[in-house]
């Protein structure tokens, strides 16, 4: 691979090739990033809902046990 780029100017290696790669694989990169972000968002919502459920159940259990003590 290095033999291919040896005679070329620096801007071909560092500007043109990455730009061409982004143009060719840009849709794939965007879809993968979108999938990962969506998955992380769903995971965050899941954790928040489970945490809220645990909080509500503990709050309810503590209030019902304190009522039975009376």
Curated annotation (Swiss-Prot):
Q: Which InterPro entries does the UniProt entry name for this protein?
A: Uncharacterised_SCO3924
Q: Which UniProt keywords apply?
A: Cell membrane, Membrane, Transmembrane, Transmembrane helix
Note the Pfam families from the entry. DUF5326
Coiled-coil segments: none
Membrane as a keyword of this entry, yes or no, is yes
**Any one of the GO CC terms:** plasma membrane
Give the stretches traversing the membrane: 19-39, 40-60
Taxonomic superkingdom: Bacteria
Membrane topology category: Multi-pass membrane protein
Its primary localisation, in coarse terms, equals: membrane
Q: Spell out the subcellular localization from the entry.
A: Cell membrane
- The protein here is known as Uncharacterized protein SCO3924
Q: What is the lineage of its organism?
A: Bacteria, Bacillati, Actinomycetota, Actinomycetes, Kitasatosporales
């Amino acid at each position: 691979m290095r033999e291919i780029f040896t005679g070329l100017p620096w801007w071909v290696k560092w500007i043109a090739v990455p730009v061409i790669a982004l143009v060719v694989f840009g849709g794939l990169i965007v879809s993968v990033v979108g999938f990962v972000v969506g998955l992380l968002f769903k995971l965050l919502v899941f954790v928040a809902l489970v945490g809220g459920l645990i909080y509500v159940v503990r709050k309810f259990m503590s209030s019902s046990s304190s009522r039975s003590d009376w």
